[in-house]
Structures are given as C-alpha cells and as structure tokens.
Amino acid sequence: MLDIAIIGCGVIGAAAAYELSHYPLQTAIFEAENDVADCTTKANSAILHAGYDPEPGTRMARLNVEGSALAKEICARLDVPYLQCGSLVLALSPAELAHLQKLYENGLANGVPGIRLLSAEETRAMEPGLSPEVAG
C-alpha cells in the first residue's frame, strides 16, 4: 500500500521523491513520459529564482531564497554539477532604472546573497555586447 503518490517526475516531482525517501514511507512516482524531466522541466530556463522580485515578507520571497540555497545543497550532496553564474536584469530607461532600484531593495530585504546594483558602465564591462542604451 502506498503512502504517497507523486504525479510527474520533473524537477519538482523528483525533488519531492528525494526528500520523502528520508522517511519510512512507501512512495511511488507516476510519470506519463518515457523518461524523467521530459516535459516542462526539459523546456525551462534553468534559472533558480533568487528572490529579488517578490515583495519582502511574503512567503514567495522566503521560499525563493530558501529554495535557491536548498537546490545548491542538494546538488552538492548528490554530486550534481551546479554553476551559480548569476543574472543581469537590465534597464533601458529612467523608469526601468527606478524599477531596478526597487528590485535591488527587495533583494536586500529578502536576504538575497550577492545582490548588486550595477552602473551602466559596470554592466557593459561585464557584457560588452549590450546596447549602449543600457542604463544599468
């Protein structure tokens, strides 16, 4: 008799099964495809959301930061290659620059590690092919 049935073995289903394997439960995964991670997970952008977008104090803000750290920990435990390369969020106008400032403040409040607000020059130094219109 099963205690837990997991529908789908994408990254979330596989992670749930992995975590549940640490408990004395009978768990099964039911996957419609011929292989694991062969649908939505296969088509994702492979970005872990850092937590700068959600409003501070929300569950999403907390889970983004905790989930990102947990993914890194699980990869290390399972000897899965993991590259934390960061991401750039660009602004092309003063209004977008103000929005970047808000995202930066959210990230600080949410405890996002390593978050920085770059000038236009710093941004183009990192990525020389960017438009000269990049404001930050």
Write out the residue ranges for each language-model feature:
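N-terminal Rossmann-like FAD-binding beta1-loop-alpha1 element of flavoenzymes
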Residues: 2-29
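Short N-terminal amphipathic alpha-helix/helix-capping patch enriched in small hydrophobics
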Residues: 16, 32, 44, 64-67
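Short glycine-/acidic-enriched loop or helix-start segments at secondary-structure transitions
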Residues: 16, 39, 100, 127
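Glycine-rich FAD pyrophosphate-binding loop
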Residues: 21-43
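Proline-centered flexible-loop/turn and helix-kink motifs
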Residues: 23-25, 76, 128
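Short clusters of hydrophobic/aromatic residues that line enzyme substrate/ligand-binding pockets
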Residues: 36, 48, 130
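Dinucleotide-binding Rossmann-like beta1-alpha1 core, especially the glycine-rich loop
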Residues: 46-126
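Short, intrinsically disordered, charge-balanced linker/junction segments flanking boundaries
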Residues: 132-136
